[in-house]
Amino acid sequence: MPKPTISYSLNGLPAAAVDSIGSLLEILARIRGIVLTEQSNDETASIIISAPDVHRLVVGSDDSHYDSTTLYIEDFLNRLCEALDAVGKKAEAGAFRHALQLYHTDRELGALKHGESVTNRQLKNDSFEDLEFLVEAWLVALNSEESARKLPAPLPVKSPDTRAMTLAEKILAHHAFSLPSSGGLKSGELGMKHGMVSIGELPSVWRNDRFWLAGDHTVEPRTYDQPRVRELLNGLNDAKQEFKMTENQGSNYTILHTEFVRERAEPGMLALGSDSHTCSAGAVSCLAIGLGAADVMTALATGETWIKVPESIRIDFTGEPAWYIRGKDVILYILKELKRNTFAADRIVEFGGLGARFLSCDARFAITNMCTELGGVTGIFVPDEVTNTFVSGRPQSKYKSNSIYFQPDKDASYAATFQIDLTMVESFIALHPSPDNVVPVSEKLDMSFEGCFIGACTTTEEELVLGALVLEAGLKNGLGLAPGKRMVVPGSIPIVNSLRELGLLEIYAQTGFEQPAVGCSLCLGMGADRAGEGENWISSQNRNFKNRMGKGSTGHICSAATVAASSFSMRLTNPAALLAQVSPDRYKALLESCQSYKNRVRKVKSSKKESVKRSVSVMPSYVEPYLHFRSPLTEKHTQMHAPSGGEGEQCGNLDIIESKIYALGDFVDTDAVSRDLFLHLSDVSGETMTSGVLTMLEIIPAAFILESPTDTLLGSHALEFTNPDFRDKVRQGMRVVVAGKAFGCGSSREEAPRALKGLGVQCVIAKSFSFIYGRNQPSIGLLGINIADDRFYELAKTGAGIKIDVPGRVVRLEGQNFPFVLDDMELSLIKNNGLATAYKKYGKNVFALLCNTKSSLRPSELAELQLKGVSDGMQTSLEW
């Protein structure tokens, strides 16, 4: 049977339409190898796409604002899609339709920076280029998807020999290339995982449609003229063009996490991001983990990473909260009860229970967003009817078609379990300088403020709507505005659009709230917006560390409703009285209007009907993970050696480290941030700031990293404010740092271990490491060891001699031996001077080659490995 062919005719079309259609057909041929021929008089073809009739199009179109060229092109592309469907090229037809839909969607309604105002669009040269880019990017996405490893179909029922697993363990097991046991995963085990990456920078990418990028931290229209900001803006655009990115949000369209969770993340996905608040995507039951830059960039290039499965704790919600209690007050209550870096430290926080059905996905966003403040690796909600309704209500099918609904086994093992009664949640405030220093608002009334801030990623759309209604109630009561600064910064342009359409932005304006561009703003205090020295602020952001909002400032965090109520008098005010005047029905109606605005997209002809209406709330159909098991390798295929030369190379022989100790305490933080410190950081006026005060123990000041310093330069500033003798002591031979609990807690930045390594530190020993910091150490080539024995810390005084036998997995101190666990993957990374160097050496096969070492354990021992477990000093290691 002859192969179906498609020919076309462009007779009578204007030159602009012919040129644009020709360019699109050339892209189709170049990327997908589908060649259409222009029809000749004697040619026969299975399908002929004739030239559109412009008179018919103009008369029959309801798009009177479109010029004829626009209509010619769109009609031709619709016919092309039908022809591609007819010859079995449905994927290509879908790519064209999706590109057209994005192209015709208003940027403020979710076009992800590609669209202009629908009512004003006319196809001009620059917009022709936009359409061509979209088509090319989505056709390239087909190629990258086909070449990437595909996840297997999940199983309908659980195999009888599969061990009980938590939700996180099931997601990791399903994404794993191979497992250390045929029975599934449990805490402490290692596997190689697929990763959907949210940010990074490498000369190639694994999949151009799985790379989410947004400029939010320091880029802002008021700073666009600054050299460093221009460099970042150019980098955003270069990445979009070079990688043909389908998910490049540009600058000031969305905070990184906001639209990613609202429109892209799906249940059962695995997401990696270079920001500690990546955990926000747990709101839609996506396992989202923040990692350091080296980890994320390598995953971006390879689509692979390695993960030691963390333990999980379980939080079950009970009861029904008051209608005005949103996610921010819930997570503050959890922080109040559990405290920071305690039960959740280095663990995944799994949320569920009967009360979870009263928590919207916006509320869940605020809760999972602040799991990093709780000290957790990430947070994730068990998917339910709330999740299913939210995801299935997305207007575009492409962004709801990859969902996999797992649920934890009833007999899964948790490190700890808790119940949170939602009826006990009230309006709370976390007092400076810690997110867990939480008290009821009613206990601290009349605290005075110089500023009020409603914004940051943790402040969701529903919180912004409620804040506006509280302000409206205050205006109706005739409340005056005391002197002070007020600012509102929604998390994305689509949210801004909804608030504007509903008249709520006008309410914020009437009550004195400035409205700068979308971004992190005061939550970070490193861009155009900064709290002044000595100022006291109340904020709906997620962190209230010292100097977080600006040098010398203090901040307290609470819900948007509490900030709004306090903004009239500039004194802490319980919002209850104003909330009592807000109609719950009106609030609900406004949220439904927000959803309808989000779903207001221009329809594109399709071979099948698609609804953009929110579906009826139903429980999802749960499935079980498909498990890949491969027996441990018995032979070495690769012998790896640390590369010679290069900055920050490990000193001496890694097998045996003999040195002296420099002792630190608990909670050494990478992110107790002094934002305006030193070293060539310019403010909005262009002045250079060269001083600052750091009162909490941190490894490296955050603001310093903006200048992309070397490891050695970072090391020259390590702990310089809190421990001024540290650098000299290390240089004099104290090259082993001993610390307590949660060493490296804070952000995902890898500059902290880089600073220690650059100074000459050979090893850090701690009772526990923050998850991200603990990952960053081997990824940059620095040895880190966990020892839980209290006797060790009684002996480990500054200046004491210490010997570390890495092959023997034992530390010798004051005549006593202390065994430790070090996985082969971690050791391989360290011996190769870190992940970046290993990637340069091995390329996209880096993980396969790093894993090709002989296991020191039998399969039965592999299956029994526990997180950070030590048994009689036995070396424990895993392979895939």
From Swiss-Prot:
Q: Could you tell me the EC number(s) of this protein?
A: 4.2.1.33
Cofactor annotation comment:
Binds 1 [4Fe-4S] cluster per subunit.
**Catalytic function, reaction form:** (2R,3S)-3-isopropylmalate = (2S)-2-isopropylmalate
**What residues does [4Fe-4S] cluster bind to?**
457, 520, 523
The Swiss-Prot or TrEMBL record lists the needed cofactor(s) as: [4Fe-4S] cluster
Pfam families the UniProt entry points to: Aconitase, Aconitase_C
Protein name listed in UniProt:
3-isopropylmalate dehydratase large subunit gloJ
